[in-house]
Amino acid sequence: MSNVPAELKYSKEHEWLRKEADGTYTVGITEHAQELLGDMVFVDLPEVGATVSAGDDCSVAESVKAASDIYAPVSGEIVAVNDALSDSPELVNSEPYAGGWIFKIKASDESELESLLDATAYEALLEDE
């Protein structure tokens, strides 16, 4: 079973979301998602300053197996991207919940967080797959 940190929120598309001290949210893909994709070769990062809606595809993770869209779990403005992934996309594999984060977003509607899954619900989703 994949590692599913309890403090994070999750989307049904296998993104995770962590609230930061400054009020922004860090987004990445889950350990389960990176296991399905395999070794990352490239991550197409969103543009800082871009405004996205929940469910918009805003990034692409390319692995040796496939390319997969990464969706915004909440609406808002992209305020930072993980530039380290340009040179080291494998961080998504080795540190999916730490150094392999993909972007940070300033949420425009925090009520959208209610539609995300907690760790228990995400684990149940994985068991059903």
UniProtKB/Swiss-Prot annotation:
GO terms for biological process: glycine decarboxylation via glycine cleavage system. The glycine cleavage system catalyzes the degradation of glycine. The H protein shuttles the methylamine group of glycine from the P protein to the T protein. Transmembrane segments: none annotated. Its cofactor is (R)-lipoate. The keyword DNA repair does not apply. Residues 24-106 form the Lipoyl-binding domain. Binds 1 lipoyl cofactor covalently. It comes from Salmonella gallinarum (strain 287/91 / NCTC 13346). The modification N6-lipoyllysine is found at K65. Keywords: Lipoyl. Pfam families: GCV_H (PF01597). Belongs to the GcvH family. HAMAP family: GcvH. The glycine cleavage system is composed of four proteins: P, T, L and H. The gene is gcvH. This is Glycine cleavage system H protein. GO terms for cellular component: cytosol; glycine cleavage complex. The keyword Mitochondrion does not apply. NCBIfam families: gcvH, PRK01202.1.
